[in-house]
């Protein structure tokens, strides 16, 4: 797994734990740093900060374009993967659009249900098509 792939995976862990425990993602990061004295990968931190700062808009896009699904109905891990993928797709110009989608699908293949990769691919693919109008 690439360094960025590991960073995505760690960001997913942080965001997932924060959601499950009703904590701030930054509190989870701080707690992990204190417990392990590990240096947090800068890209992990960038993802967490990006998702947190754009979460309202990201969630609105996901609610609007996930046909027949609400965020609450989605498996938690899918919701977090979609938030990371949407942030990379719409708000991080350093990641090519296709890479953002394929990396999100790869996370879903290893961490979620059998149906999740195609759902995530379809939803992020739709957001990729609409990207110019979403950011206008």
Curated annotation (Swiss-Prot):
Entry's Gene Ontology cellular component terms: cytosol
Alphabetically ordered keywords of this record: RNA-binding, Transcription, Transcription antitermination, Transcription regulation
InterPro entries: NusB-like_sf (IPR035926), NusB_fam (IPR011605), NusB_RsmB_TIM44 (IPR006027)
Gene3D superfamilies the UniProt entry points to: NusB-like
One GO biological process term: DNA-templated transcription termination
Gene Ontology molecular function, alphabetical: RNA binding
Domain of life: Bacteria
Function: Involved in transcription antitermination. Required for transcription of ribosomal RNA (rRNA) genes. Binds specifically to the boxA antiterminator sequence of the ribosomal RNA (rrn) operons.
UniProt similarity note: Belongs to the NusB family.
Protein name, as recorded: Transcription antitermination protein NusB
Gene of this entry: nusB
